[in-house]
Amino acid sequence: MSSIKITFPDNSVKEFDAGVTTAEIAKSISISLAKKAVAGKVDGNFVDLNQPLKEDGSIEIITKDSNDGLVVLWRTAAQVLANALHELYPNMKFGMGDVTEHGFYFDTDNSESQVAETDFEKISQKMSEIIKANLPIERVEFSEEEALNLVSGDEYQEELVRDVANKNNGRVVAYKQGDFIDITDGVVLSSTGEVKIFKLLSVAGAYWKGASSNPMLQRIYGTAFYKQKDLDAELQRQKEARERDHRVIGNELDLFFVDPKVGAGLPYWMPNGATIRRVIERYIIDKEVAWGFQHVYTPVLANLNLYKQSGHWDHYREDMFPPMDMGDGEMLELRPMNCPSHIQVYNHHKRSYRELPLRIAELGMMHRYEKSGALTGLSRVREMTLNDGHDFIEPDHIEDEIKTLIKLMTEVYNDFDITDYRFRLSYRDPKNTEKYFDDDEMWEKSQSKLKAAMDDMGLEYFEAEGEAAFYGPKIDVQTKTALGGEETLSTIQLDFLLPERFDLKYIGADGEEHRPVMVHRGIVSTMERFTAYLTEMYKGAFPTWLAPHQVDIIPVKNDLHMDYVNDLSSKLRAHGIRVTVDDRNEKMGYKIRQAQVNKIPYTLVIGDEEVSNGTVTVRKYGEEKTNTMTKAEFKNLLFEDIENYSREK
């Protein structure tokens, strides 16, 4: 029998008989590894434990205690779910199953009746029966014709078979457990009995293949773990996530809403939400002006030719709204980006090196055609206002400008008490270069400049291929969300392309024309996404300087204490404090509880003693104790809180 060479993560090499499996390789290393092994990765591709290996390659043994080990478990649990549904609902049709960040799902279409969460008990019971039966899970291959015969009558599975066969030269990979066959090449465990701890979570709608033009299917979500304590921790995390969900808090605090009569992804900002947004906007404008940015206003509409020249029409068209034909040959486009507009600002005057760096900024409204299935509250919308800026600089000032922008970003993060983030250097995908501007020298030069700036500042970062913009590499700041995910909040992008496409120039110290470099930067993303992020981070309890209502004043008796309350509220409002007066005919305890429910930072109670002594009784949000102090003392406390961005000294 012929042999193959297997390379291990420590670069050691061993020979095995051709046809050896990952399970056998794991066992050859140690019995304990074999017990923990759930799959393998050969040359970076998943293989199941029993899949014969016929060629030389590098291998990684995937174990239960790894993230990849969880992925294999979740894929298997999704199959067990589909098998259970197949037994319970014989006429059910099946879309696709997959893993999520924290579990799995399977899409289904049941013409007889919709699956509800009340059905989860019987579905879970059937899953437990399949798990207890410990059915072996076998990898099988079919021709396209054979696979189509197996799934005949299920149009979703038929379409899936054709897609898979088209990618795999007419071959279709599937996994079989008992009589159930799942069309997938996603690697799974060796038997159903290895899925011991699972829970079904929710059911929602999802378009087939994510396209709104396709039928709406039911998506059943679940999660699974190898240990009960890990499932318990995940359920606690999800409970916390529900409590922090900005859509839930936004409704409770009346921050925003989306009206289906108006359109998906087009939020209305209610007074409370608008107040938070206004404070953020004023803060960011003042901060950027202090750092040398000049703010502008530019049109939300532009001639389509502007975006053809910039390259957005070629590279970004699917995320843009259709152009508007004005009937006279002019085509107008809702802008998806602000950079071409800021280039027009730069080009409006002849520029000198003495003006550089020229830093243009705007809170610019944009429109992007997000698919309806991707829209989420404020975090994914179709109309958004981006905190955007573009620096036009001399080429030999790149590293200095990058450092300046990173310092600005970290100062802003500090003011908002954002601490859990990391830097990502985002490069183009060298295996898929057609997605990007074709200039290898430019890419190498710009990527090295970003890396040098980060290294010089001593910042830790990780590198990611395929995450660059089409015109250049970037530094992304990946923030940890309160719900356990990660998203890009800030970005700094280096661009040699657009200055060339728009023929940007400046007169250098030598009196000659030179080409500037353009730096795209966004510090706090869009107002929509940043507000969603902060709402979840603060759990709706905004710091005093951001809170829509900063002080709630409650008179004990309206007929005796309102003059004092009105005088106090007027003086606080004169200093820009956002004050509410709760003079409703309700019990005192109820009004105090409502102030806590509304997460108002300071509640003041005014009764006979306070009026007589010129004092206020203060209760801070989240605290049971109260403090009585003079009005001047409270004013100083409040102002210091606001001026210090509510940070503890």
Curated annotation (Swiss-Prot):
The keyword tRNA-binding applies. GO terms for cellular component: cytoplasm. It is found in: Cytoplasm. Its cofactor is Zn(2+). Its EC number is 6.1.1.3. Residues 245-543 are annotated as: Catalytic. This is Threonine--tRNA ligase. It catalyses: tRNA(Thr) + L-threonine + ATP = L-threonyl-tRNA(Thr) + AMP + diphosphate + H(+). The keyword Membrane does not apply. Catalyzes the attachment of threonine to tRNA(Thr) in a two-step reaction: L-threonine is first activated by ATP to form Thr-AMP and then transferred to the acceptor end of tRNA(Thr). Also edits incorrectly charged L-seryl-tRNA(Thr). Keywords: Aminoacyl-tRNA synthetase, ATP-binding, Cytoplasm, Ligase, Metal-binding, Nucleotide-binding, Protein biosynthesis, RNA-binding, tRNA-binding, Zinc. Homodimer. Residues 1-63 form the TGS domain. GO terms for molecular function: ATP binding; catalytic activity, acting on a protein; metal ion binding; threonine-tRNA ligase activity; transferase activity; tRNA binding. One of its GO terms (biological process) is threonyl-tRNA aminoacylation. Belongs to the class-II aminoacyl-tRNA synthetase family. Zn(2+) binds at residues 339, 390, 520. Binds 1 zinc ion per subunit.
